[in-house]
């Protein structure tokens, strides 16, 4: 077998090692004259095997911050780390700015400014958005029963025609006597009650002007026949309403002023305590017409009176 001299082909490991040595030489030669990204043109110190590591260097140029550090690997090789940061200015509220100036304590007493991973966990920011539903508010306003009574004038003062009771009128001591004097001059009577339709005439005195005794058979109305009260009572039951949640200070006159604007009233019954004479909290109002009673229920039910909300409903017919 013939033998001859020939060049052996180098292995792949030898090629990589030779290329690495060439790269190190070229890199060390080029870094000597290349300026830093921050504009620093000072030459880089040479990293010799026996020399100590240079101290870290920090350079700030505008909003760019460059930090240069040197470290040694386990095999004794030295290398340089260059980190570049962009400085951002963020606006914070006064409360956040004051908290950042607080002095740290405990395990973080000697930590630099900013959060420490060992003691602080920084989570994602959660943005809260407060939404007010105007539609729900509009629905609540529409369902409010008090809004239905805003355009209605339920109570009218007899003295100043205001929206309050006559007994609580601020002008009753001044305008009241003046109206009485004017009514007397015009020939009007303010003391007599207004006669309602269907109301009977008051019974005259038993004695005549001469002072003689008049027997009952000869008095006014003796020739008239008595009328049955059953039909009238049934009509009253059909147009009677029941008012509850009244205050203890309520009187018949207050109920008369409250329900008179809705129609003619035939009778009012206010339940009272026998010993104290105060109201028990409910009353019955009878109208001459059922339509007036229906308007009174729609207008007064839910109305605020003497710091209480009145409840008005149809009265149950009597079984007697």
Curated annotation (Swiss-Prot):
Positions of the RRM domain: 239-317
Pfam families for this protein: eIF3g, RRM_1
InterPro entries attached to this UniProt entry: eIF3_g, eIF3g_N, eIF3G_RRM, Nucleotide-bd_a/b_plait_sf, RBD_domain_sf, RRM_dom
Region (Disordered): 1-60, 204-233
GO biological process, one term: translational initiation
SUPFAM superfamilies to which the protein is assigned, alphabetical: RNA-binding domain, RBD
Compositional bias of kind Basic and acidic residues: 221-233
Family in the record: Belongs to the eIF-3 subunit G family.
Name this protein carries in UniProt: Eukaryotic translation initiation factor 3 subunit G
